[in-house]
């Protein structure tokens, strides 16, 4: 409370997770969009951009692992500040506008914080010089009294001849001496990664890992269309680069749901643990770190490796989270901890509970903290030894107050996909006072991916957006992960690759129809759909492609035409703009192509200052609807970005009103005030 200047209730802490300091005497937490370091001995907190030396790090800086140095961008160059003495050192000198170092100032997400990855000894940083020269601008217009303001930034689109390129470098800080720049001896890389549609991951660069001694940097280069990825190692002293092997897929290499590297370099044994979906599942493989030759496959069979929890080099064992396999009575999305040898032998399940497990290893690897739960059962947190034996139950979540207040969990279900064979999974939200003799309209909350799905976490969550709130107004609300979303096999994940207009919609319709047969209180003749971003694309798409099934749609901030969205997204999941035969690869997937099919009630919503999905996506759909003579509703939020910020609750209330009036057939209360968003007690 002292650090934030606000009131904090000990029973409702304003954070859900924390990072334990290396000394085990402090934690780092994120509160109200700020990060704080908290001393567990003194019970005091301070902003994380200040250090134990008492000297504040510059705003938007990256602090070294030892906490002594901060690196930041100034005038397109990198500077370092010694947080003990306050001395500032200019690390680079040739950075200029549109060709700066470590910049994150362009594309669909941008900030002023440098993208760097520190070496373990805090003496070097891996980064790049980003070439934005010649990249086209995107524009937004901010309204104000008098002349409006033009906002412009670099934002390439699919098919552009010039897109971002990065020249990789290592910068040696050389405290007490002159800094040195080591440029990689290779052409500039594409602005691509295997684990994101960006190159920033967890505060650093995606797809890079330092050798423990800082002598080399391992990294992955991806092709523009994501069909190829090359594993490479750079000498940190000379910049010489070795390419060990190429990973290639007919669709796209990578799994953007991972959001972090799923490979490890092991210089002590001259080996690499690599991941691949070449066998239709995400498995681990052991490679020779010198020759790039495959030694053996580590994990096999049905199921994915979702995370590497720990690598025990001495025992030659890996602890991994796995999911994806079809086991009767088990949700295939549940992640569980396994141990397996480098040679692929001895695969052992260590967390047998039929639930989704979130596991953290102790620094010495002798213990694991395991929090497991399901969408409808509360978390249990236990302490396990390295063999999975439960040593102590640390905590059991108590839901009694939630239940006393009328709360009830969603209902997990599985139904058949469009093919009538494949199981797909979802959650159903019903009114707390459900009358099974009544008929309730059904609303589908959709996010089609491809990098995630509608359901979200398979762990317990007391609230999932406003799904339950909408259900309380008299609806059945469902979220279904259709074919073309991650967490299953590669063929499942890539099901609609190259056909983004699919949006899992045939699976949504099939699943909703099956649920209506199973639960007689569902009125399948009154079906609605809504979503945001990719879900906005999908919900409008649903109204155009399934006009006789969906009666009401609410489409927020949709990337309705991926020719008007950032280059990396479409080129990863749809392919390049122009096919090999010279024809357009995107027009058939754009929503305005099918707007003439609208029959039901549709609301289009977009923030006019959306710098992720430009509002012109919605403008094109609106224009097509007007040209087709269709009635529709339009809500443009003047100052909202991709998220609606202070206008979030207004948009949510309007959405509730829209479904109540047009799908439920009732009159909502006029201008109901939901409350102010973002207030943390």
List the predicted regions and their residue ranges:
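Serine-hydrolase catalytic core recognition
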Residues: 136-137, 183, 205-207, 214, ...
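Beta-propeller folds
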Residues: 1-379, 383-384, 400-404, 424, ...
């Amino acid at each position: 409370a002292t650090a934030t200047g606000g009131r904090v209730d000990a029973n409702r802490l304003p954070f859900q997770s924390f990072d334990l300091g290396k000394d085990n005497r402090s934690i780092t937490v994120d509160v109200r969009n700020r990060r704080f370091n908290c001393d567990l001995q003194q019970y005091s907190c301070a902003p994380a951009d200040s250090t134990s030396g008492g000297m504040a790090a510059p705003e938007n800086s990256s602090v070294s692992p030892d906490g002594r140095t901060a690196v930041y961008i100034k005038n397109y160059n990198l500077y370092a500040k010694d947080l003990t003495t306050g001395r500032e050192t200019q690390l680079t000198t040739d950075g200029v506008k549109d060709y700066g170092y470590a910049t994150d100032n362009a594309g669909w997400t941008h900030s002023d914080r440098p993208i760097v990855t520190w070496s373990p000894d805090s003496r070097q940083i891996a980064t790049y010089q980003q070439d934005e020269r010649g990249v086209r601008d995107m524009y937004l217009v901010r309204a104000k009294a008098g002349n409006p303001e033009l906002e412009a930034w670099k934002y390439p689109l699919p098919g552009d001849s010039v897109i971002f390129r990065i020249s990789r470098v290592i910068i040696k800080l050389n405290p007490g001496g002159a800094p040195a720049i080591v440029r990689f001896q290779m052409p500039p890389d594409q602005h691509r990664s295997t684990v994101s549609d960006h190159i920033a991951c967890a505060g650093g660069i995606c797809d890079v890992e330092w050798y423990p001694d800082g002598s080399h940097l391992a990294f992955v280069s991806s092709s523009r269309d994501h069909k190829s990825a090359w594993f490479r190692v750079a000498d940190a002293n000379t910049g010489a680069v070795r390419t060990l092997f190429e990973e290639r897929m007919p669709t796209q290499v990578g799994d953007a749901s991972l959001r972090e590297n799923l490979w490890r370099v092991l210089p002590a044994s001259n080996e690499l643990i690599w991941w691949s979906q070449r066998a239709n599942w995400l498995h681990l493989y052991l490679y020779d770190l010198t020759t790039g030759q495959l030694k053996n496959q580590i994990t096999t069979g049905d199921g994915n490796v979702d995370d590497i929890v720990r690598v025990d080099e001495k025992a030659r064992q890996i602890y991994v989270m796995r999911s994806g396999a079809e086991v009767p009575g088990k949700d295939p999305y549940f992640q569980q901890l396994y141990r397996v040898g480098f040679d692929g032998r001895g695969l052992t399940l260590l967390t047998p509970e039929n639930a989704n497990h979130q596991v953290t290893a102790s620094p010495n690897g002798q213990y694991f903290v395991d929090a497991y739960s399901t969408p409808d059962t509360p978390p249990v947190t236990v302490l396990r030894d390295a063999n999975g034996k439960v040593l102590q139950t640390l905590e059991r979540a108590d839901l009694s107050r939630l239940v006393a207040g009328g709360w009830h969990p969603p209902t997990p279900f599985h139904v058949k996909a469009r093919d009538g064979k494949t199981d797909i999974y979802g959650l159903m939200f019903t009114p707390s006072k459900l009358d099974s003799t009544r008929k309730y309209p059904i609303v589908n909350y959709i996010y089609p991916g491809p990098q995630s799905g509608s359901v979200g976490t398979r762990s317990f969550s007391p609230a999932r957006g406003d799904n339950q709130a909408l259900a309380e107004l008299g609806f059945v609300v469902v979220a279904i992960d259709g074919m073309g979303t991650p967490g299953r096999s590669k063929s499942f994940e890539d099901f609609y690759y190259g056909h983004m207009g699919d949006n899992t919609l045939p699976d949504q319709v099939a699943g909703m129809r099956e649920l209506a047969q199973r639960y007689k209180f569902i009125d399948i003749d009154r079906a609605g759909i809504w979503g945001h971003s990719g879900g906005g694309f999908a919900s409008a798409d649903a109204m155009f492609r399934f006009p006789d099934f969906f009666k009401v749609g609410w489409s927020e901030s949709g990337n309705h035409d991926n020719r008007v969205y950032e280059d990396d997204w479409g080129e990863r999941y749809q392919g390049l703009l122009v096919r090999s035969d010279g024809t357009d690869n995107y027009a058939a997937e754009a929503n305005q192509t099918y707007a003439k099919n609208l029959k039901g009630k549709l609301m289009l919503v977009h923030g006019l200052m959306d710098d992720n999905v430009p509002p012109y996506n919605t403008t094109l759909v609106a224009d097509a609807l007007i040209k087709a003579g269709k009635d529709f509703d339009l809500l443009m939020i003047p100052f909202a970005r991709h998220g609606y910020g202070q206008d979030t609750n207004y948009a949510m209330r309007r959405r509730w009103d829209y479904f109540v009036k047009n799908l439920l057939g009732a009159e909502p209360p006029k201008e109901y005030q939901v409350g102010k968003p973002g207030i943390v007690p």
